C-alpha cells in the first residue's frame, strides 16, 4: 500500500478532536510517516503503535503516567541517554498522554530534531487503542470490484457478470422489493478483520444507480432513506451468466467461493434467460446461504437421504409395485 499520504499531519487532523490532541512542538516534521518496509513487516497495527519501548520500539511511541514516572526516577545521565535513543528511532510522532507535563528535555530534543510531539489529557491506553484501530483501517488491504452491492435480508450481496446482463435492472427490482443499495458499478472493499470484508460506495457515486434507458437514478430520493446503506459486510457473490444449458451445472456438489482480499466468499451462479424471475432466484440464494451459515446444507441432507434409500430401499418404499 502507498503510505506516502499517511504522515503526522494527516493522523493529527483525523484524530485531534476525538483524542483531544495538542501539537506541542516539532511542527517542521509534519511530513514524517511510515516507511513501506515498516508497514509491510507489521503483522498488525499493534506493531505500529504502542507504549514507550526502547528494546522493541514501535513506530508511534506513547508515554503515559508510568513512563513519565519511570523517567523521573532515572539519573540525569540515564534520562539523557533514553531521550537520545527515543529520538534516534525517528518515530512519525510522540504522544505524551494522561495530562502529564512533557519532560523539558524531551520537548527540547523534539524541537531540535523536528520530531512532532503531541499531548493529550486522555489515558495512554485509550490513545493506543484508538490509534491502533485508526491505523488498522487506513492500512487495511483494499480493492475495487465491478458490480451492484446490495443489502438483501441483512446480508451483503454483490451482483457480478458481464456488461449488458441486467445487473442494475436486477438491483432496481430488488430495491423495489424492500432491499437496500450500497453501491453500483464500482464498490470499494476493505478487509478490516481476519474474517470479514466490508464494502462501501465511493463518495462520487453515493446513492446512485445507473439503469440503461433511464440514466442515473437517485435511489435515496426516489425510494427514501431506508433504501440505501452506508456499508455492508460481503457474504455472497451472485454471478449472472448467459450460457447454454449443457455448460451449466445444475447441482454443484461443492460450494463455490471467490477470493476477495485473501478471504473466500461464497458464490452462486445464476443463468440469465428469458422468463426467469431473477429477483426471486437471488432472494432464494441468499436465504439458502443464510441456512448454510447456520449449518443447514440442503444438498448434503438430500444426498444422505438418497444414500440411506439405496442401502435399505424397503424402508423408503414399503409398498410393492403392481
From Swiss-Prot:
Entry annotation: catalytic residues: 146, 167, 185 (proton acceptor), 250
Positions bound to Mg(2+): 168, 210
Stretch list, region Important for the catalytic mechanism of dephosphorylation: 271-276
Coiled coil regions, renumbered to chain: none
Matching InterPro entries: HPr(Ser)_kin/Pase (IPR003755), Hpr_kin/Pase_C (IPR011104), Hpr_kin/Pase_Hpr_N (IPR011126), P-loop_NTPase (IPR027417), Ser_kin/Pase_Hpr-like_N_sf (IPR028979)
Record CDD domains: HprK_C
Keywords: ATP-binding, Kinase, Magnesium, Metal-binding, Multifunctional enzyme, Nucleotide-binding, Serine/threonine-protein kinase, Transferase
Top EC category: transferase
Keyword Metal-binding: yes
Function (record text): Catalyzes the ATP- as well as the pyrophosphate-dependent phosphorylation of a specific serine residue in HPr, a phosphocarrier protein of the phosphoenolpyruvate-dependent sugar phosphotransferase system (PTS). HprK/P also catalyzes the pyrophosphate-producing, inorganic phosphate-dependent dephosphorylation (phosphorolysis) of seryl-phosphorylated HPr (P-Ser-HPr).
Domain writeup: The Walker A ATP-binding motif also binds Pi and PPi.
Assembly and oligomerization: Homohexamer.
Family under the similarity heading: Belongs to the HPrK/P family.
Family annotation (NCBIfam families): hpr-ser
Name this protein carries in UniProt: HPr kinase/phosphorylase
Organism encoding this protein: Paraburkholderia phytofirmans (strain DSM 17436 / LMG 22146 / PsJN)
Lineage, top ranks: Bacteria, Pseudomonadati, Pseudomonadota, Betaproteobacteria, Burkholderiales
Gene transcribed to yield this protein: hprK
Amino acid at each position: 500500500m502507498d503510505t506516502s499520504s499517511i504522515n503526522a499531519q494527516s493522523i493529527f487532523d483525523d484524530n485531534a478532536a476525538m483524542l483531544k490532541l495538542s501539537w506541542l512542538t516539532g511542527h517542521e516534521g509534519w511530513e514524517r510517516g511510515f516507511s513501506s518496509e515498516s508497514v509491510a513487516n507489521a503483522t498488525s497495527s499493534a506493531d505500529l503503535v504502542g507504549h514507550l519501548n526502547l528494546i522493541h520500539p514501535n513506530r508511534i511511541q506513547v508515554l503515559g503516567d508510568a513512563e513519565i514516572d519511570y523517567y523521573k526516577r532515572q539519573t540525569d545521565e540515564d534520562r539523557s541517554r533514553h531521550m537520545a535513543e527515543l529520538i534516534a528511532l525517528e518515530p512519525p510522532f510522540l504522544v505524551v498522554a494522561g495530562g502529564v507535563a512533557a519532560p523539558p528535555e524531551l520537548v527540547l530534543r523534539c524541537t531540535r530534531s523536528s520530531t512532532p510531539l503531541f499531548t493529550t489529557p486522555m489515558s495512554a491506553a485509550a490513545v493506543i487503542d484508538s490509534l491502533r484501530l485508526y491505523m488498522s483501517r487506513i492500512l487495511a488491504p483494499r480493492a475495487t470490484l465491478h458490480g451492484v452491492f446490495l443489502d438483501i435480508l441483512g446480508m451483503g450481496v454483490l451482483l457480478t457478470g458481464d456488461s449488458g446482463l441486467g445487473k442494475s435492472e436486477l438491483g432496481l427490482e430488488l430495491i423495489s422489493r424492500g432491499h437496500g443499495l450500497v453501491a453500483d458499478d464500482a464498490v470499494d472493499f476493505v478487509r478490516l478483520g481476519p474474517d470479514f470484508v466490508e464494502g462501501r460506495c465511493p463518495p462520487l457515486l453515493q446513492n446512485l444507480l445507473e439503469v440503461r434507458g433511464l440514466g442515473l437514478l437517485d435511489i435515496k430520493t426516489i425510494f427514501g432513506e431506508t433504501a440505501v446503506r452506508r456499508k455492508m459486510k460481503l457474504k455472497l457473490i451472485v454471478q449472472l451468466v448467459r450460457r447454454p444449458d449443457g455448460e451449466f451445472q445444475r447441482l454443484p456438489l461443492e460450494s463455490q467461493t471467490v477470493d476477495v482480499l485473501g478471504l473466500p466468499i461464497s458464490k452462486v451462479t445464476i443463468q440469465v434467460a428469458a422468463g426467469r424471475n431473477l429477483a426471486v432466484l437471488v432472494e432464494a440464494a441468499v436465504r439458502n446461504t443464510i441456512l448454510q451459515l447456520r449449518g443447514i446444507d440442503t444438498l448434503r441432507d438430500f444426498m444422505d437421504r438418497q444414500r440411506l434409500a439405496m442401502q435399505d430401499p424397503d424402508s423408503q418404499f414399503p409398498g410393492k409395485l403392481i
